[in-house]
């Protein structure tokens, strides 16, 4: 038998190509392939992947293979690809039932989800999925600014973002939202920060995870940058934007800068740690004016997108 990644049979186990950093130690289970939307102008993750929902028996076969390898040692599972909540509720419940039957010590099952899908899905369906054992949703907000959401072709309005978050929390999910620092470029950082804070304040998610935007080849925003239509924000602008975002937030969320490409390792519980994180940003802004080495380090970090 040919063994591939993690010792599983290379010819049949279907690994999700992406997962959140917080799921580094989780078993990866692919329920869908690609992205059903796949139009966001900043993203090239699934541009070459045709979206499809995997057959239930294929998924169960992967679960059985993982059980053969790991036995009862699996404690967390991440479901990929980009939006497993688009799967019919009864099918997703069967997948979750199979996971918990196979791994008796399973404590957490998480998944990417799209806000538009969550906003449309009936609350009763979300409650069934939560009761079956899906515990946390990772959702890309990117920005709460209405105009920017249109520009980056996110396919959801601020109101739909809020509806998705509130409904998911009501169903009992932990809700983890992702914000793209710098997605407004050099010119729109203030409206990006304020609009994003406004949406986050209405949702009050469990986790706010920030990522520094880096234009990806084969994406429309990369082409816009190459043609001079999008101006990458400076490290100072990214830091000022982050500071303004924190100042405008009135939530009870974990604020996490948990990716190596981010300029500062900001981690804290809001509101208690807000001033501590703002102080870190102020110190970094002062340092940029005094230390060329710090600027070089920050510029380098923005290029570390594949870790």
Where are these regions (language model features)?
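Structural preference for beta-strand elements that scaffold enzyme active sites
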Residues: 28, 76-78, 108-110, 136-138, ...
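Conserved strand-turn element in the central/C-terminal portion of the radical SAM core barrel
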Residues: 116, 140, 144-148, 168-192, ...
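Catalytic cores of alpha/beta
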Residues: 124-126, 184-202
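Conserved SAM/AdoMet-binding glycine-rich loop
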Residues: 67-170, 250
């Amino acid at each position: 038998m040919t063994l591939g990644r993690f010792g599983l049979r290379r010819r049949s186990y279907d690994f999700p190509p992406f997962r959140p950093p917080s799921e580094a130690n989780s078993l990866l289970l692919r329920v869908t392939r690609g992205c059903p939307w796949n139009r966001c102008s900043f993203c090239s993750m699934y541009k070459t992947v045709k979206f499809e929902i995997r057959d239930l028996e294929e998924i169960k076969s992967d679960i059985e293979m993982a059980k053969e390898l790991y036995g009862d040692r699996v404690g967390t599972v991440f479901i990929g690809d980009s939006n497993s909540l688009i799967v019919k509720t009864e099918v997703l419940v069967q997948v979750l039932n199979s996971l918990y039957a196979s791994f008796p010590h399973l404590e957490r099952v998480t998944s990417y989800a799209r806000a538009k899908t969550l906003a449309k899905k009936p609350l009763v369906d979300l409650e069934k999925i939560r009761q079956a054992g899906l515990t946390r949703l990772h959702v890309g907000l990117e920005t709460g600014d209405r105009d920017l959401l249109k520009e980056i072709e996110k396919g959801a309005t601020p109101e739909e973002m809020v509806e998705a978050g509130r409904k998911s929390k009501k169903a009992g999910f932990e809700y983890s939202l992702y914000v793209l620092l710098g997605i407004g470029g050099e010119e729109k950082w203030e409206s990006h920060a304020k609009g994003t804070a406004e949406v986050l304040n209405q949702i009050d998610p469990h986790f706010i995870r920030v990522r520094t935007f880096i234009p990806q080849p084969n994406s429309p925003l990369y082409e816009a940058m190459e043609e001079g239509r999008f101006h990458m924000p400076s490290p100072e602008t990214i830091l000022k934007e982050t500071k303004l975002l924190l100042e405008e937030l009135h939530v009870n969320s974990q604020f996490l800068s948990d990716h190596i490409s981010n300029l500062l390792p900001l981690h804290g519980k809001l509101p208690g740690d807000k001033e501590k994180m703002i102080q870190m940003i102020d110190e970094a802004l002062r340092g940029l004016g005094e230390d060329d080495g710090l600027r070089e380090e920050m510029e380098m970090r923005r290029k570390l997108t594949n870790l």
